[in-house]
Regions:
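Short, solvent-exposed loop/turn segments that connect beta-strands within catalytic domains
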Residues: 6, 60-62, 88-92, 171-175
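Outer-membrane beta-barrel signature, preferentially recognizing the C-terminal barrel domain
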Residues: 1-39, 44-47, 57-78, 83-85, ...
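Outer-membrane beta-barrel transmembrane domain signature
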Residues: 154-160
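Residues on the lipid-exposed face of transmembrane beta-strands in outer-membrane beta-barrel proteins
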Residues: 27-31, 80-84, 124-128, 163-167, ...
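C-terminal beta-signal and adjacent terminal beta-strands/loops
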Residues: 46-48, 146, 167-216
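Outer-membrane beta-barrel domain signature
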Residues: 14-18, 67-73, 109-115, 150-154, ...
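Outer-membrane beta-barrel translocator domains and adjoining extracellular loop/strand segments
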Residues: 1-8, 50-58, 103-115, 139, ...
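Gram-negative outer-membrane beta-barrel transporters
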Residues: 37-47, 64-147, 189
Length: 216
């Protein structure tokens, strides 16, 4: 037991926790052509003796107390990815892509929601690729998370807009690239529902950077 500064929590363990057991099921579909790619996954997990860390409502050393608990639980969700090439201009390709994921996790026998579960997330992007450069813009949407555990605060949804440009001065076959990126262009206040520190530290605001990447 003791304070964990990185998560801003006073954590309490339990030496009597049992081993977890899980039964997992997954349904997966995939389709791919030279111009189109699609995949979707539906999964469900049933846990015996699921171990999780939850807030108790107590304060110790000026930090909220989080304790490890154990109960049966059910987790299910969906994941989706797709990409489509829209056009080809000589050595350049224009394409769009998207990602979606959603997870639900509940403690069995009326135990409520598992803490720190991310909400529905949607991400879409458009990208122009060339032997010497890539241009990309993307939008990421995160829904509100109101399905929370006891003492856990709801999390407001947010939308991030990002853009980047990559230049490969010696072509795609050489592992040298200069990257200019702009993240959270509209400087929105964003908090991840799965973060221990969401109530204290939001995600970074508007951010511009230039980096050099050399791969070996």
């Amino acid at each position: 037991n003791g304070p964990h500064i990185a998560t801003q929590a006073y954590e309490m363990g339990d030496p009597d926790l049992k081993s977890e057991r899980a039964w997992n099921g997954e349904l997966y579909a995939r389709y791919e052509t030279p111009a189109t790619a699609f995949s979707a996954t539906l999964y469900t997990n049933r846990f015996d003796n699921f171990i999780y860390e939850a807030e108790t409502g107590d304060i110790e050393d000026d930090l909220p107390v989080f304790q490890y608990f154990q109960n049966d639980a059910k987790v299910w969700g969906i994941e989706f990815q797709a990409s489509q090439r829209l056009a080809n201009f000589g050595s350049s390709d224009l394409s769009v892509d998207g990602v979606a994921d959603y997870t639900r996790a509940k403690i069995s026998s009326g135990g409520g929601d598992v803490p720190r579960i991310p909400p529905l997330r949607l991400l879409g992007g458009v990208e122009l690729t060339h032997a010497s450069f890539d241009l990309r813009g993307e939008v990421e949407f995160n829904d509100d998370q109101t399905k929370t555990a006891a003492f856990e605060t709801p999390t407001n949804g947010f939308t991030l807009v990002n853009a980047s440009a990559t230049w490969r001065p010696f072509g795609r076959d050489r592992n040298i690239a200069l990257i200019a990126s702009a993240n959270n262009i509209f400087d929105v206040t964003a908090r991840r529902a799965a973060s221990f520190t969401k109530d204290f530290v939001p995600l970074a605001g508007r951010d511009f950077r230039v980096t050099a990447r050399v791969s070996f």
